[in-house]
């Protein structure tokens, strides 16, 4: 597969904004679980199904990710540096991916697609982000905004995505960074 062009794109992942400053994890899960179950899901339902709201009012602590994943029947992937083929295979076979990244603080986003001409420099990652961000152009996403009213779809280069993804592993207790359904 290395060196060949491809385009994996889950176009039917609903973009869902996060309702509060600290609910990116729930909104991102609502996108992934909603895709898997073929329904529109409110992030509040994710929170309610994950335990008491007070437990998660300050966000989802990395140590709580496994229990959260189990509650929603999402498979956990151990942190690792993905090759183009590895990320492509995971996305293609499992569906959209809930990802913990550092932007610079911990933040959950959803990978909905990956496309490439077969080279590292021309490989791009499609993102559904529950926070508002200037989408810019492919490989040139703009700054995060001070709002979370709509969420944003944008495209990062593989290198940009890898920097945000791998930087999250430097945070304490980050042992799980990717969650996914087992397809539909």
Q: What kind of feature is each model-predicted range?
A:
Residues 1, 55, 92, 114-184:
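Noncatalytic regulatory segments and standalone regulatory/sensor domains
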Residues 2-78, 164-184:
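Cysteine-nucleophile protease catalytic domains, especially the papain-like/related folds used
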Residues 14, 48-57, 97-99, 103-104, ...:
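Peptidoglycan cell-wall recognition and remodeling modules
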Residues 23-24, 35-38, 101, 107-108, ...:
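Broad hydrophobic/π-residue packing in well-ordered secondary structure
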Residues 41-43, 60-61, 82-83, 119, ...:
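Helix N-cap and loop-to-helix transition residues
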Residues 77-132:
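Active-site-adjacent substructure of cysteine-protease-like catalytic cores
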């Amino acid at each position: 597969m290395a060196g060949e062009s491809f385009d994996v794109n889950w176009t039917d992942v609903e973009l869902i904004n996060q309702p509060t400053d600290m609910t990116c994890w729930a909104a991102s899960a609502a996108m992934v679980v909603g895709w898997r179950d073929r329904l529109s899901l409110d992030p509040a339902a994710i929170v309610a199904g994950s335990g008491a709201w007070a437990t998660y009012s300050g966000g989802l602590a990395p140590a709580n990710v496994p229990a959260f994943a189990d509650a929603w029947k999402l498979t956990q992937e151990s942190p690792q540096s993905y090759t183009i083929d590895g990320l492509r295979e995971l996305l293609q076979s499992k569906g959209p991916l809930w990802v913990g990244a550092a932007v610079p603080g911990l933040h959950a986003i959803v990978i909905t697609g990956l496309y490439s001409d077969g080279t590292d420099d021309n490989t791009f990652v499609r993102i559904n982000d529950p926070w508002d961000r200037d989408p810019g152009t492919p490989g040139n996403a703009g700054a995060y905004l001070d709002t979370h009213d709509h969420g944003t779809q944008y495209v990062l280069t593989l290198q940009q995505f890898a920097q945000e993804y791998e930087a999250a592993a430097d945070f304490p207790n980050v042992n799980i960074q990717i969650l996914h359904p087992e397809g539909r």
